[in-house]
Design a protein with these regions (language model features):
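Nucleotide/pyrophosphate-binding catalytic subdomain
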Residues: 1-215, 306, 382-383
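Short phosphate-binding/catalytic loops that engage adenosine nucleotides
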Residues: 33, 89, 223, 286, ...
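Terminal amphipathic helices with adjacent charged low-complexity linkers/tails
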Residues: 39-46, 227-244, 299-300, 305
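Short hydrophobic alpha-helical runs that function as membrane-insertion/retention elements
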Residues: 167-171, 225-227, 289, 370
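Surface-exposed amphipathic alpha-helical tracts and adjacent flexible/coil segments at the periphery
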Residues: 210, 221, 232-237, 312
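Acidic-aromatic/histidine active-site loop/patch
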Residues: 218
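A conserved regulatory-domain signal marking ACT and ACT-like small-molecule sensing domains
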Residues: 238-402
Length: 402
């Protein structure tokens, strides 16, 4: 059996935790399994690298940031291989170059294109545990790239797919996927299982346990996925195509405080305007989420949308540079907002779900600024100061603690 295991930064934050991870991996190895381990940088090391970089340059080039970031994961995998060796088990650490993890050239948000698994297979054939850097790749120029937030999750599922792994396990500082972030909602309950589609929406909308791109890939390649704690032996949560128990009306509530709203005011009310606006952003690799179009002054319209706060400067810059092409009058950015979402496949066959969510927010005096929906989710834009309170109110309204 071939198992791919991914451990986040908190799981390898210090010597004790590194050895804890090493021992867990060795348990599976000694059962005769082939084991591939994907690691993030230790603890808050990536944040420390960002601070160091900005002490030198307030707006460092993205290519150089990628060069810097790769240090963190390389440190983690080398120390892990050393720990396993000290416990009497052969292990080898490999980085993106050695694995030939090819990506696009979008520094800071590259996408995986191809993985050459030959080197990993050779090491597994020699009965070694293979420890691979997450989060990083190489582009066609042989420059380092990074995969953006949640990149180590994406690395792990891509390796699982390339190696035709029998199982993919992701270890975090929580015991699985919960109905809400247990650090913000004390009544949150761990789910035994959840569908790919539900997990994808929760990941996209702010649930930090998994990254949306990794869930997309897991679904695409049918990779079995288990989310569990690195600190104990609890069963965790299974993410798969269909759940075996009766579908819940709502599977979870997510809160995203990393969004900002951009309002483009005074657009001409004519064909092609929306295309020009969002094409301009797409060419800068800026993802747009919630979109609202409203009637403006005579003969004009306004469009508001949300982007990740890390993309705000790039978004405002490219829109200002293309004002004459797009044809708007004013541009505004609003910070201190939050996206609150409910997700659940059960809402497809149950009317009144959105109304129940809106009622719970009304009862708590929370104002809704924007609304977006799909078959299995409802998202509202609210003030950030109301976020955690509103999240708990909605969680209670749908009895998710039961």
């Amino acid at each position: 059996m071939l198992i791919v295991k991914k451990f986040g930064g908190t799981s390898v934050a210090n010597k004790e935790r590194i050895f804890n991870v090493a021992k867990r991996c060795i348990e599976d190895y000694k059962k005769g399994n082939d084991v591939v381990v994907v690691l993030s940088a230790m603890g808050k090391y990536t944040d420390e690298l960002i601070t160091m970089a900005r002490d030198i340059n307030e707006k460092p080039p993205k290519r150089e940031m990628d060069m810097l970031f790769t240090i963190g994961e390389q440190m983690s995998v080398a120390l892990m291989a050393m720990a396993m060796d000290s416990l009497g088990v052969p292990a080898v650490s490999l980085n993106a170059f050695q694995v030939a993890m090819h990506t696009t050239s979008a520094h800071g948000s590259a996408r995986l294109k191809k993985i050459d698994a030959a080197r990993i297979r050779r090491e597994l054939d020699n009965r070694r545990i293979v420890v691979v850097t997450g989060f990083q790749g190489i582009d066609k120029y042989n420059d380092y790239t990074t995969l953006g937030r949640g990149g180590s999750d994406t690395t792990a599922v891509a390796l699982a797919a390339a190696l035709h792994a029998d199982a993919w396990e992701i270890y975090t500082d929580v015991e699985g996927v919960y109905t809400a972030d247990p650090r913000k909602v004390p009544k949150a309950r761990k789910l035994k299982e959840i569908t790919y589609d539900e997990m994808l929406d929760l990941a996209t909308l702010g649930a930090g346990v998994l990254h949306n791109r990794s869930v997309e890939m897991a679904k695409k390649y049918g990779v079995p996925l288990v989310v569990r704690s690195s600190l104990n032996n609890s069963e965790g949560t299974v993410v798969k195509e269909e759940v075996t128990v009766e579908r819940m009306l709502i599977s979870g509530v997510a809160l995203d405080t990393d969004a900002v709203r951009i309002a483009v005011i005074g657009l001409k009310d004519s064909p092609g305007v929306a295309f020009k606006l969002f094409d301009t952003l797409a060419k800068k690799n800026i993802n747009v989420d919630m979109i609202l179009q409203s009637i403006g002054r005579a003969g004009t319209k306004d469009i508001s949308f949300t982007v990740d706060k890390n993309d705000l400067d790039d978004a405002m810059g490219v829109l200002e540079a293309n004002q004459s092409r797009i044809g708007y009058v004013e541009l505004h950015a609003e910070k201190n907002i939050a996206k609150l979402s409910i997700v659940g496949a059960g809402m497809m066959s149950n009317p009144g779900v959105a109304a129940k969510m809106f009622e719970s927010l009304y009862n708590e005096g929370v104002n809704i600024n924007m609304i977006a929906t799909s078959e299995i989710r409802v998202t509202v834009l609210i003030n950030e100061k109301d976020g955690v309170h509103a999240m708990n109110a909605v969680h209670d309204a749908f009895n998710l603690a039961d």
